[in-house]
């Protein structure tokens, strides 16, 4: 279930037009992504900042890691989409909508990794958790009981 406490009001802080940031993907390839600005938010009295990808007037794409990465959520991080900031730069960060990247489900996907700036010293307990493939779950690994014959 969604946790309303993880719907947090953020503030979009724009960068100069045309700014990009290097993004490394899971296989080590680096590419430049449009970086229109960052989103700042507060949680438990601390201010956090996440660099965003996308276009300045559109939806923002966030690639982040937090203290649950590898401890309840996908180790390489999670993705989150946000609506475009309003005219005052306000944007709602709904961490309930944080999701695992495609590479969490298949080794055939390449995914961007969170840049160092987006590795948060915060445990985001909302959103998608670690995916366990049915063939690797403990139920699938345990032997099935068979009926014995007299």
For each feature predicted by the language model, list its residue ranges:
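Beta-strand elements of well-folded, non-transmembrane domains
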Residues: 12-14, 43-45, 66, 97-99
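Well-ordered beta-sheet/strand-loop patches within structured domains
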Residues: 12, 42-45, 54, 85, ...
């Amino acid at each position: 279930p969604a946790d309303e406490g993880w719907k947090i009001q953020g503030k979009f802080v724009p960068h100069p037009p045309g700014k990009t940031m290097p993004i490394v993907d899971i296989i080590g390839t680096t590419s430049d992504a449009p970086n229109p600005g960052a989103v700042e938010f507060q949680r438990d009295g601390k201010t956090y900042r996440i660099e965003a990808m996308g276009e300045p007037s559109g939806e923002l794409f966030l690639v982040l890691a937090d203290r649950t990465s590898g401890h309840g959520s996908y180790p390489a991080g999670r993705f989150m989409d946000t609506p475009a900031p309003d005219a005052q730069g306000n944007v709602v960060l709904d961490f309930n909508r944080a999701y695992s990247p495609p590479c969490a489900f298949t080794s055939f996907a390449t995914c961007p990794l969170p840049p160092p700036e987006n590795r948060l010293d915060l445990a985001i307990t909302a959103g998608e958790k670690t995916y366990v493939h049915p063939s690797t779950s403990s139920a699938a690994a345990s032997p099935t009981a068979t009926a014995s014959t007299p």
